């Protein structure tokens, strides 16, 4: 486990070598939230638990949902994904995001359909803000919008990107994070705005 960030009442850890990238958000009030799950390993689960008690495992999309049942059982955590994404995830989802699911008042979900039907981001709203974009955006250097042949709807991705430009945050993480190469902040929101403005003009 590599600690990437420590700010007011929160820390972000990275699970080295995970693809898609897996992160652990530790919030002083909400507890531990695992973002994506790698192939299950009991030793890794024990390491994660030593960092923080995990209350939730959040899947931004189907791409990061690996060995869902095993992680859920080992961590005694509740699994979370959008209602639209649940049918594509192999394993039990306890909380289907449909506008009513809340982990804590300082955290919210941003639906960013497009890469998959139910792609969703997790935002920690307390300043400085932190957003886990999953596959909605991708690290080039800073996160950007990149089209894929198998996008559920690139048009939806563009609409989501426009909405992202109005958000306030300092740190951003995506599924294709590469430790030591990907930039995540501070200054992520402004860098993403610049990238998106350029891409949407192209």
Residue ranges and their predicted role:
Residues 1-7:
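Long, non-catalytic terminal segments
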Residues 7-14, 104-110:
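Short, hydrophobic/aromatic-rich segments at coil-to-beta transitions
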Residues 10, 32-34, 40, 69-202:
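Metallo-beta-lactamase
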Residues 14-56:
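Pre-active-site segment of Zn-dependent metallo-hydrolases
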Residues 39-85:
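Active-site metal-binding motif and surrounding structural segment of the metallo-beta-lactamase
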Residues 44-46, 67-69, 90-91, 142-143, ...:
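Short glycine-/acidic-enriched loop or helix-start segments at secondary-structure transitions
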Residues 57-64, 114-117, 176:
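Histidine-centered catalytic micro-motifs
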